[in-house]
Amino acid sequence: PDLVISVHMNKFSDANRRGPQVFFQRGDKESKRFADNIQTALNAFVGNDKHAALSGDFFICQCAPVPSVIVECGFLSNKEEERLLLNADYREQLSESIVRGVFLYLYSK
């Protein structure tokens, strides 16, 4: 593969947390650029500019020989966001935003 995107739903003890969050492998500059582009597209979709892509040590990203990210689509622990994530139209728009982020990454090299 040329890129790896692992898609998840998030859950957190603070039920007020919401919004998509993108993670990348610490120290991987290309994955950071990839994550930043997806996070920007997701932030535009949900109307939130507070989230920045976050680094960490993630097994799936460590194993990938190509730029890789983890996309947490939202927090199931937030009842309002859970309701949105259960809506097929919302999920389609969310996935289209991820695709926009991929295009931003691919065409901004």
For the regions a protein language model found, what residue spans apply to each?
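Active-site-proximal helix/loop segments of hydrolytic enzymes
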Residues: P1-K109
